[in-house]
């Protein structure tokens, strides 16, 4: 979990912006989206191979 410490003279907006940035870097939202629905192992393998194919031919 991302955690930030708010400074004495720091506004709530800047602290929220900093928190969102740390969450983005940690990949919190992307992980949550991945685990939103169950994905069968066969589907995971298929997506992984398609992504590798895209990287290879790009």
UniProtKB/Swiss-Prot annotation:
Disordered: annotated segments: 27-58
Keywords associated with the record: Ribonucleoprotein, Ribosomal protein
One Gene Ontology biological process: translation
Single GO molecular function: structural constituent of ribosome
GO cellular component, one term: ribosome
Regions of compositional bias (Basic residues) in chain numbering: 43-58
Record field: compositional bias (Basic and acidic residues): 31-42
InterPro entries for the chain: Ribosomal_bS21 (IPR001911), Ribosomal_bS21_CS (IPR018278), Ribosomal_bS21_sf (IPR038380)
A Pfam family the protein falls into: Ribosomal_S21
PANTHER family documented for this protein: MITOCHONDRIAL 28S RIBOSOMAL PROTEIN S21, SMALL RIBOSOMAL SUBUNIT PROTEIN BS21
Family note: Belongs to the bacterial ribosomal protein bS21 family.
Protein's name in the database: Small ribosomal subunit protein bS21
Organism: Desulfitobacterium hafniense (strain Y51)
């Amino acid at each position: 979990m991302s955690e930030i410490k708010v400074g004495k003279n720091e506004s709530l907006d800047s602290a929220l912006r900093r928190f969102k940035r740390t969450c983005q870097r940690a990949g919190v939202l992307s992980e949550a989206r991945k685990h939103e629905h169950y994905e069968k192992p066969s589907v995971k393998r298929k997506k992984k191979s398609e992504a590798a194919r895209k990287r290879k031919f790009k």
